[in-house]
């Protein structure tokens, strides 16, 4: 049920004064729907209030713009305005501090959410304990001199190593043959030519072919189980 006309005017007047800004009929009608007021009733109340001098209005073509009477409001002086600006600045500063606090709390929450749960920590602890136990068992076997490498794996590595040594020996011999031929027919000093071409012998870089080749023989002489 719609309010009576006098109640409607009171509602509309209170709304216009609270808003204290230019309003048209549609603005007021949309905002006052919660009071079950129709647009026609709002229009009638606005016109009645304007005729009574309780609000003011201006006409722009066919549209009327209504606004609260400004003489009913206390206008602050320059000192009061300055105080209001100062208070507003303090409030803005407090607002920024609150926003920062909220942001810090949200970051802390995200950080806590990204951490492991108790259940995950327990699972990780159990996994690490298992890995440590396995490593300790391997260490005990090593100390006891037990071979941890399978014989077939050991032989495969030794065969591959021997093949690489043979390739090294062949390439070393090929280089020597080619190098001897080049230096014999070159008028330049061997050392000078070597530096000019950027050639380095194994010995120049701290390598000893024989030392690596001897490892094969040493490996064959080692007793089993070591």
Swiss-Prot record:
The keyword Nucleus applies. It is found in: Nucleus. SUPFAM superfamilies: Winged helix' DNA-binding domain. Disruption phenotype: Sterility due to failure of both male and female gametophyte development. One of its GO terms (biological process) is chiasma assembly. Residues 76-150 form a coiled coil. Signal peptide: none annotated. Keywords: Coiled coil, DNA recombination, Meiosis, Nucleus. Expressed in vegetative and reproductive tissues. Found in seedlings, leaves and flowers. It holds the Pfam family LZ3wCH. The keyword Phosphoprotein does not apply. InterPro entries: Hop2_WH_dom, LZ3wCH, WH-like_DNA-bd_sf, WH_DNA-bd_sf. GO terms for cellular component: nucleus. Involved in bivalent formation and segregation of homologous chromosomes in meiosis. PANTHER family: HOMOLOGOUS-PAIRING PROTEIN 2 HOMOLOG, TBP-1 INTERACTING PROTEIN. Interacts with MND1 and MIP1. Belongs to the HOP2 family. This is Homologous-pairing protein 2 homolog. The gene is HOP2.
């Amino acid at each position: 049920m719609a309010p009576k006309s006098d109640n409607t005017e009171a509602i509309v007047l209170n709304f216009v004064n609270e808003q204290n800004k230019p309003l048209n009929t549609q603005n007021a009608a949309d905002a006052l729907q919660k009071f079950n007021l129709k647009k026609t009733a709002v229009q009638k109340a606005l016109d009645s209030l304007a005729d009574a001098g309780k609000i003011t209005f201006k006409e722009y073509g066919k549209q009327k713009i209504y606004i609260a009477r400004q003489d009913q409001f206390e206008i602050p002086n320059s000192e009061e305005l300055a105080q209001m600006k100062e208070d507003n600045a303090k409030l803005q500063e407090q607002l920024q501090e609150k926003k920062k606090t909220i942001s810090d709390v949200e970051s802390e929450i995200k950080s806590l959410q990204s951490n492991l749960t108790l259940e995950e920590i327990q699972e990780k602890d159990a996994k690490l304990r298992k890995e440590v136990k396995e490593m300790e068992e391997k260490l005990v076997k090593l100390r006891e001199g037990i071979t941890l490498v399978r014989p077939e794996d050991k032989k495969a590595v030794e065969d591959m190593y021997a093949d690489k040594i043979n390739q090294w020996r062949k390439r070393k011999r090929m280089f020597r043959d080619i190098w001897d031929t080049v230096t014999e027919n070159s008028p330049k000093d061997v050392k000078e030519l070597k530096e000019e071409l950027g050639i380095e012998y194994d010995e120049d870089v701290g390598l000893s072919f024989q030392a690596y080749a001897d490892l094969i023989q040493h490996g064959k002489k080692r007793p089993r189980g070591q």
